A protein has these predicted regions:
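Conserved ABC ATPase signature
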Residues: 126-130, 134
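Conserved beta-strand-loop-alpha-helix hinge in the C-terminal portion
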Residues: 207-230
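Catalytic Walker B motif of ABC-type/P-loop ATPase nucleotide-binding domains
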Residues: 151-155
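ABC ATPase NBD coupling module
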Residues: 62-77, 98, 104
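A short, proline-enriched helix->beta-strand linker immediately N-terminal to the Walker B motif
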Residues: 145-149
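Conserved ABC ATPase "signature" region
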Residues: 104-122, 173-174
Length: 230
């Protein structure tokens, strides 16, 4: 369970106040206008941005006081950040170690991660030899190899076409359910949220709150979000 209490975050005069909320296992869509603070929220939890105040408790520890590498969080960004000169196998292995040589156990773990995202047989290819969807799968495999209980997704599939994006969303849902992860997915697409998100978080007017069940939340748009949804 991830519990947020008295959390304030943002830049300059744009400080967002998050309602006290507890997130259990499941997928949460994070929806709001551009510049509302969606990505900053994820970056604050991950440790890439400092909070103004408050706490984010997981297993009796405040994430906001931990070093980035010690937080139980893995994050996937819009850019897949694959190194073009390295093979897909080596790119994924970087989640475990930067050393050139891996133990047999580590090699098996990398292979298993690639197999899980449907990239078995692509180990020796370079990122430039893969399609956009396959590159997204490789980036997801690298995140999975970190074995973190909280997964933050900052529009990682926004550049993909509808069919490939849906494929990746379905894969995330399958993995989240199997691993009982807490997943926060930033998206501008209500369709994406309806497809895989159990619950929805709205961010607007310097406020972040859990709106509840995704289908119900998107059928009953609050006044603060009317301009965004149109």
């Amino acid at each position: 369970m991830l519990s947020i209490k008295n959390l304030k975050f943002g830049h300059g005069s744009h400080i967002v106040v998050a309602e006290n909320t507890a997130f259990g296992g499941g997928i949460y869509g994070v929806i709001g206008p551009s510049g509302s603070g969606k990505s900053t929220f994820l970056n604050t939890l991950a440790g890439f941005h400092n909070s103004e105040s408050g706490s984010a408790m997981y297993e009796d520890r405040d994430l906001l006081t931990q070093r980035v590498e010690d937080r139980p969080i893995a994050m996937l960004f819009q850019s897949n950040n694959l190194f073009p000169h390295l093979s897909i196998f080596r790119n994924v292995a970087l989640a475990m170690t930067s050393r050139r040589w891996l133990t047999k156990v580590q090699q098996r773990q990398v292979s298993d991660a690639l197999d899980r995202v449907g990239l078995s047989g692509f180990e020796n290819r370079k990122p430039g030899e893969l399609s956009g969807g396959q590159q997204s799968r490789a980036a997801l495999a690298r995140v999975l190899l970190q074995k973190k209980p909280i997964l933050l997704l900052d529009e990682p599939f926004a550049a993909l076409g509808p069919a490939m994006r849906n494929e990746m969303l379905d894969l995330v849902k399958e993995i989240a359910e199997t691993d009982n992860q807490i997943v926060l997915l930033v998206t501008h697409s209500p369709d994406d949220a309806l497809r895989i998100c159990d619950q929805t978080i709205f961010v607007s007017n310097k406020r972040l709150w859990l709106a509840g069940d995704t289908k119900i939340a998107l059928q009953n748009i609050p006044s603060e979000m009317q301009d965004y949804f149109g």
